[in-house]
């Protein structure tokens, strides 16, 4: 593994220049469109439109009886508990001799004479000269549909449900298919995460893309729903990895200051992709056409093979420096920067030279204290049992796992439940995607000012209360129900955005990946229930909303027992994780940014190649690079070592500030670029004068760890 920190490389070639912008937006497209279409196209492909029993004896009477009159004759009413009529039954019919009833009606038909009393009735019947048709008798015997169903084709020309009659006793099939899709995603997330770590992000991306395109197209030709479900299960292996891995590749090309921004923007891309799916569904109303339209075009993404590079962070982690050098040189050229040839090799030599020389210029092997320190055995590695063994960590972990389940179930449930709101399926789904966009903007602004804890609590509470309130809305006030459901979607989308930042900041560094992997798996198991929650709409339109709203409110109430992480030094060891938040106050609010002097120690630098094998179902940022933030400093003092606070622009990392001083780091450093790394352009990024650097260290910082870094820089100048 190379000793080069890629964030330090980005100081020279640009943290977010033209190259990163091009790659980021290309990767956003490849991450969000396939993922949104793959996960949510089934909302329209397997939609269940209004339906009722088919009565063959009445099929030829369309000229004599309207649709409503045929329903009134053949279908029993479904009544509410208060006895009020709700609607016609979808799965039951009167078990009578319809031929005899119709013949009797036609035989007794007499052309009525116009009178004052029945003039209106005659005008209504003048087209046929027939009296009003017979209507069903509630006392007639009732049976299940015997001859299939008739489907309302106002919104859909055809769906898998209408083709295969997956209604009534078979209405559980679409929910089961969705559940098996997410079973596949549980294992695919682990498998492709391992592939991405072992063979590279780029390799994993094209493997996932191949899997999705092939099986999505194959799904379009399913002869029955068993085959369809099997193919969807295999297709589930590619979700959410098809979203996760391109996004992580994009993040690994950027500097740490821009990763929060990148995380929010890709959320907006995903929401836009969902709205686009609704538009496609509206334009292409046949499930087969829609299925092909949401799979075949992604063949074009294979052209990325000649555009998208491998992650240079991953290449450096595998010590493939020459391959990373090619990418870095291209990055610098497009960003308008100039770096010397063999830039990474020279940087590695320089780093090794630093590591081989102690602060006073002596070789570390000659320092007995240094050898004694090196001989100390490292502390035992953290294990999943540490999540159970430590009470405070255990409490936080179980709350986070429950909140993860709540967010995942409610978000996906509200997305799929768009077809049960009583308005156009396309319109409801389209609005559901649009309301997510402002939720991300507001969350991005709020969570760095109000804190993660209260924003998570309030957004989950908002979404939950809105959904539960649907139980008080009259049945015919459909747009009130839709509005409340959209407020629920707004709240849960916002809470999901802040949750991924919060969960990474709460867990200690040594346990972060393992804990997130376990919590992610628990959330994935909980997610298997949401299709059946949505299916409960066959009994009551608002029942799924009530259940999901209750779950969201429960998540909001548990989240207030988590400590705030805004502007707080993040835990790194098991001991720090156990102490973190142990004495927090329930109704406390986030504090103002704290100075470096108030923190016990600074955070560890981020890993150059974070593991993907245990990432979350819906990841926003990579584990170490995005979540481990540095402590803030008092901006009233000109401290040259500013730390990254919550990933916000305007604060620079330790490596950037070291480069900004323009100082060489070893006595042997020379300006000759053939022998040492050129740092000339770094001086342009510095913001301090020589007079400021000459000020006494003890007047500028109080933290001894920061002072040591400055002293080491001074000694090498």
Protein language model regions, located:
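Helix-breaking motifs and short loop linkers at transmembrane-helix boundaries and internal kinks
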Residues: 200, 221-226, 284, 473-476
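Glycine-rich segments within core transmembrane alpha-helices of 12-TM secondary carriers
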Residues: 31, 35, 184-185, 239-243, ...
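Conserved MFS/SLC helix-loop-helix module at the cytosolic interface between two early adjacent transmembrane helices
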Residues: 187-209
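Flexible cytoplasmic loops linking transmembrane helices in multi-pass membrane transporters
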Residues: 4-22, 78-172, 334-416, 584-649, ...
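Conserved glycine-rich helix-kink/hinge and helix-boundary motifs of the Major Facilitator Superfamily
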Residues: 29, 175, 206, 260-264, ...
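Interfacial helix-cap and linker-helix signal at transmembrane-aqueous boundaries
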Residues: 49, 168, 195-196, 281-285, ...
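C-terminal transmembrane bundle
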Residues: 36, 40, 232, 236, ...
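Central cavity-lining transmembrane alpha-helices of secondary-active solute carriers
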Residues: 179-192, 430-442
């Amino acid at each position: 593994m190379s000793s080069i920190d890629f964030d330090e490389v980005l100081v020279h070639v640009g943290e977010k220049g033209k190259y990163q912008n091009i790659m980021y937006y290309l990767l956003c497209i490849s991450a969000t469109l396939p993922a949104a279409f793959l996960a949510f196209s089934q909302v329209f492909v397997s939609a269940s439109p209004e339906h009722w029993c088919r009565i063959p004896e009445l099929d030829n009477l369309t000229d004599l009886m309207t649709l409503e009159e045929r329903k009134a004759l053949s279908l029993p009413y479904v009544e509410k508990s208060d006895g009020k009529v709700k609607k016609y039954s979808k799965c039951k019919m009167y078990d009578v001799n319809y031929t005899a009833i119709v013949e009797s009606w036609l035989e007794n038909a007499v052309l009525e004479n116009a009178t004052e009393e029945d003039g209106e009735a005659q005008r209504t019947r003048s087209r046929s000269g027939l009296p009003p048709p017979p209507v069903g008798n509630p006392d007639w015997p009732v049976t299940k549909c015997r001859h299939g169903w008739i489907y309302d084709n106002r919104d859909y020309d055809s769906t898998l449900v209408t083709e295969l009659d997956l209604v009534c006793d078979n209405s559980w099939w679409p929910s089961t298919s969705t559940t098996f899709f997410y079973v596949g995603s549980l294992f695919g997330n682990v498998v492709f995460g391992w592939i991405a770590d072992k063979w590279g992000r780029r390799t994993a991306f094209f493997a996932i893309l191949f899997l999705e395109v092939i099986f999505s197209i194959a799904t379009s030709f399913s002869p029955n729903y068993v085959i369809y479900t099997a193919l969807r299960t295999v297709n589930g292996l590619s979700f959410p990895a098809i979203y996760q891995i391109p996004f992580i590749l994009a993040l690994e090309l950027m500097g740490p200051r821009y990763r929060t921004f990148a995380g929010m923007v890709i959320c907006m891309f995903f929401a836009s992709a969902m709205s686009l799916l609704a538009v496609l569904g509206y334009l292409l109303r046949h499930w087969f056409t829609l299925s092909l339209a949401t799979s075949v075009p992604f063949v074009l993404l294979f052209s990325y093979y000649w555009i998208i590079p491998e992650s240079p962070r991953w290449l450096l982690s595998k010590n493939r420096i020459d391959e990373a050098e090619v990418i870095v040189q291209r990055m610098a050229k497009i960003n308008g920067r100039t770096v010397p040839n063999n830039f990474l090799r020279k940087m590695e030599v320089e780093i090794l030279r630093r590591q081989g020389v102690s602060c006073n210029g002596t070789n570390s092997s000659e320092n007995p204290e240094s050898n004694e320190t090196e001989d100390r055995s490292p502390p035992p590695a953290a294990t999943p049992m540490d999540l159970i063994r430590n009470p405070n960590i255990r409490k936080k972990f179980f709350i986070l796992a429950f909140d993860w389940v709540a967010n995942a179930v409610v978000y996906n449930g509200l997305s799929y439940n768009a077809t049960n709101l009583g308005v156009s399926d396309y319109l409801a789904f389209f609005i559901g995607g649009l309301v997510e966009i402002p939720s991300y903007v507001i969350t991005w602004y709020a969570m760095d000012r109000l804190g993660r804890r209260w924003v998570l609590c309030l957004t989950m509470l908002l979404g939950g209360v809105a959904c539960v309130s649907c139980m008080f809305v009259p049945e015919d006030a459909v747009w009130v129900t839709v509005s409340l459901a959209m407020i629920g979607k707004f709240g849960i989308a916002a809470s999901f955005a802040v949750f991924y930042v919060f969960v990474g900041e709460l867990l200690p560094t040594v346990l972060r990946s393992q804990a997130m992997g376990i919590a992610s798996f628990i959330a994935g198991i909980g997610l298997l229930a949401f299709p059946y929650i949505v299916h409960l709409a066959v009994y009551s339109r608002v029942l799924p909303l009530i259940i999901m709203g209750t779950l969201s409110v429960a998540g909001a109430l548990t989240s207030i027992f988590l400590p705030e992480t805004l502007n707080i030094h993040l835990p790194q060891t098991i001991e720090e994780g156990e102490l973190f938040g142990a004495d927090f106050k329930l109704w406390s609010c986030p504090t103002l940014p704290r100075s470096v002097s108030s923190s016990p120690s600074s955070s560890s630098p981020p890993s150059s190649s974070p593991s993907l094998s245990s990432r979350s179902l819906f990841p926003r940022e990579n584990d170490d690079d995005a979540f481990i933030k540095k402590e803030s400093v008092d901006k009233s003092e000109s401290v040259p070592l500013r730390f990254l606070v919550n990933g916000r622009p305007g604060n620079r990392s330790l490596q950037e500030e070291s480069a900004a001083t323009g100082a060489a780091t070893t006595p042997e450093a020379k300006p000759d670029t053939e022998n040492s790394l050129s740092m000339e352009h770094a001086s342009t990024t510095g913001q301090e004068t020589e007079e400021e650097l000459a000020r006494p260290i003890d007047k500028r910082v109080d933290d001894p760890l920061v002072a040591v870094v400055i002293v080491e820089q001074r000694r090498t100048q």
